[in-house]
């Protein structure tokens, strides 16, 4: 991937709502600074087509003394409505991480949001002919490029990096960890996977055995601790699949703490966006165990 250009679009300061946490010191409102920029990048899809598009990066940083560790927060995927939302912000989730002292970068990848493209660079093929590897490469290569951009910011500590993601973004986080970018300390996977469809195949992802192999491959090269969070009633990836993926990852040498939470609402796949009070304590413990207090 080649970074071609960068453009500053907006800047704003807003306050995070108070979110109850275990530590009294963290139970406070915090002002954070938000910016929106675009990177022009080139990727190669599963058909070997070169696609140039824009990655919109929404970034948040705390007030106070820097440098701040970097956190890249990766979104999931809608195969039918990729232009929505216009950009991913994850404001509530970003506030949680900013309160813990992170500079947070949320990329809206090529093919999504206001700059959604055709062809779709993350197209992984039909359900019976999935190429999960190509999707992982396209998405993770963009994360690496965003990380390079983040490292250029004067307020970051490039030696301390965490990659986080939900759904396809969680899959992308583990794929990125397998590349061992400089400074990476840990990765967090919320309901990570690909090929799920709760309407046509509830809980049963397309060609899950290929995903199991992908996670095994990731485990052979990944060196940092990872945290995996799934739920009993995930309508995209049932527990039998997420547990098999975790086992494949660990058996191949990956370091992973697996958490299977009870059923959440109608679809546990939405835990990251709607169930913060359930996952925040788990993530807090993991971050503290890896030097982010």
PLM segments and residue spans:
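N-terminal cap/lid segment of alpha/beta-hydrolase-fold proteins
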Residues: 26-65
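Short substrate-entry loop that stabilizes the transition state in hydrolases
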Residues: 66-68, 76-116, 238
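Alpha/beta-hydrolase
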Residues: 74, 107-109, 189-190, 261
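The conserved beta1-alpha1 loop
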Residues: 74-76, 230
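Alpha/beta-hydrolase active-site loop
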Residues: 122-154
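Primarily recognizes the serine-hydrolase "nucleophile elbow" in alpha/beta-hydrolase
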Residues: 141-211, 217
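The feature captures the conserved acid-bearing segment of alpha/beta-hydrolase catalytic domains
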Residues: 186, 192-252, 257
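C-terminal catalytic histidine-bearing segment of alpha/beta-hydrolase fold enzymes
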Residues: 250-293
């Amino acid at each position: 991937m080649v970074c071609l250009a960068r453009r500053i679009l907006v800047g704003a300061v807003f306050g995070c709502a108070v979110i109850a946490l275990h530590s009294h010191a963290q139970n406070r409102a915090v002002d954070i600074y938000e910016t929106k920029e675009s990177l022009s990048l080139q990727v190669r899809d599963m058909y070997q087509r070169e696609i140039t598009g824009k990655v919109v990066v929404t970034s948040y940083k705390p007030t106070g003394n820097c440098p701040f560790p970097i956190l890249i927060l990766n979104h999931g995927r809608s195969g039918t409505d990729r232009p929505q939302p216009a950009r991913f912000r994850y404001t509530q989730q970003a506030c949680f991480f900013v309160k813990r002292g992170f500079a947070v970068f949320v990329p809206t990848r090529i093919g999504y949001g206001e700059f959604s493209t055709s062809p779709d660079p993350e197209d992984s093929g039909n359900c019976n002919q999935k190429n999960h590897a190509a999707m992982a490469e396209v998405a993770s290569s963009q994360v690496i490029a965003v990380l390079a951009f983040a490292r250029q910011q004067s307020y970051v500590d490039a030696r301390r990096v965490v990659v986080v993601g939900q759904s396809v973004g969680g899959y992308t986080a583990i794929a990125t960890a397998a590349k061992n970018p400089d400074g990476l300390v840990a990765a967090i996977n919320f309901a990570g996977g690909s090929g799920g469809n709760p309407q046509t195949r509830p809980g049963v992802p397309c060609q899950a055995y290929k995903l199991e192999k992908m996670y095994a491959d990731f485990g052979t090269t990944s060196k940092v601790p990872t945290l995996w969070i799934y739920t009993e009633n995930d309508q995209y990836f049932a527990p039998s699949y997420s547990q098999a993926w975790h086992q494949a990852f660990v058996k191949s040498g990956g370091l992973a703490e697996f958490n299977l939470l009870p059923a959440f609402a109608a679809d546990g796949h939405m835990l990251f966006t709607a169930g913060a009070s359930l996952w925040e304590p788990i993530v807090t413990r993991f971050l503290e165990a890896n030097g982010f207090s």
